[in-house]
Amino acid sequence: MGYTLWNDQIVKDEEVKIDKEDRGYQFGDGVYEVVKVYNGEMFTVNEHIDRLYASAEKIRITIPYTKDKFHQLLHELVEKNELNTGHIYFQVTRGTSPRAHQFPENTVKPVIIGYTKENPRPLENLEKGVKATFVEDIRWLRCDIKSLNLLGAVLAKQEAHEKGCYEAILHRNNTVTEGSSSNVFGIKDGILYTHPANNMILKGITRDVVIACANEINMPVKEIPFTTHEALKMDELFVTSTTSEITPVIEIDGKLIRDGKVGEWTRKLQKQFETKIPKPLHI
């Protein structure tokens, strides 16, 4: 038996009831976050909460309690479910009202749901690297909002899956934007490249951590777009996300990235990232 965050309470899973006219269910009218938990501790949780509130504000949803209260509820959820290593998923929808495209009256309250899932770190992918495929980016023009509307990403990820690939690397007119569920980085001549954080991508929390790691090891960073052709010519390539951490990409559409092996700079960044992960408590 598990527990779920439901609005401002932690309740048993079976007590949660989602209304058929919840706007998240009918319109994808809401925002969400995923927080990694290592050894019982939430990783970069404040940054995720900040982004949740920012996304909500961009679509004019007011979350009905403070960030500190939200943090407290997530902490209670992790403890209640005795989560060791895994993640928390949580979302905020505009609420429940008779179906109509325009916003409901202000009396309608947002609906908040959160749950935890135990899952190990993707150590094999981190060590050996993965394959990817290029997919045209058909999503909308506000990818900076972490919206529940994920159909474009779902279709891209499915295409990658059917090709036996881990990730779809999205591009608009051959300019790489991001992955279907990740940010994309390339390394050339010791310089780290990634798409600038504008409306074409989600400004990933792990993306920010990786840029900080690069600064800490004196690795130059350039937030400028690069093309699919340039991606294939990179010395190293990797994708980042809350759950995939720094996952090397060794092949795209059958073409090896350099020699098809995980590169030296990627290993350095992984090592630096490792220093930030909460360690087990020894009593």
UniProtKB/Swiss-Prot annotation:
GO terms for molecular function: D-alanine-2-oxoglutarate aminotransferase activity; pyridoxal phosphate binding. It catalyses: D-alanine + 2-oxoglutarate = D-glutamate + pyruvate. It is an enzyme of class 2 (transferase). Keywords: Aminotransferase, Pyridoxal phosphate, Transferase. Optimum temperature is 60 degrees Celsius. Optimum pH is 8.3. Pyridoxal 5'-phosphate binds at residues 51, 178. One of its GO terms (biological process) is D-amino acid catabolic process. The active site is at residue 146. It comes from the Bacteria. It holds the Pfam family Aminotran_4. Its EC number is 2.6.1.21. The modification N6-(pyridoxal phosphate)lysine is found at residue 146. InterPro entries: Aminotrans_IV (IPR001544), Aminotrans_IV_CS (IPR018300), Aminotransferase-like (IPR036038), BCAT-like_C (IPR043132), BCAT-like_N (IPR043131), Class-IV_PLP-Dep_Aminotrnsfr (IPR050571), D_amino_transT (IPR005784). Gene3D superfamilies: 3.30.470.10, D-amino Acid Aminotransferase, subunit A, domain 2. Belongs to the class-IV pyridoxal-phosphate-dependent aminotransferase family. Acts on the D-isomers of alanine, leucine, aspartate, glutamate, aminobutyrate, norvaline and asparagine. The enzyme transfers an amino group from a substrate D-amino acid to the pyridoxal phosphate cofactor to form pyridoxamine and an alpha-keto acid in the first half-reaction. The second-half reaction is the reverse of the first, transferring the amino group from the pyridoxamine to a second alpha-keto acid to form the product D-amino acid via a ping-pong mechanism. This is an important process in the formation of D-alanine and D-glutamate, which are essential bacterial cell wall components. Homodimer. This is D-alanine aminotransferase. It comes from Bacillus sp. (strain YM-1). The gene is dat.
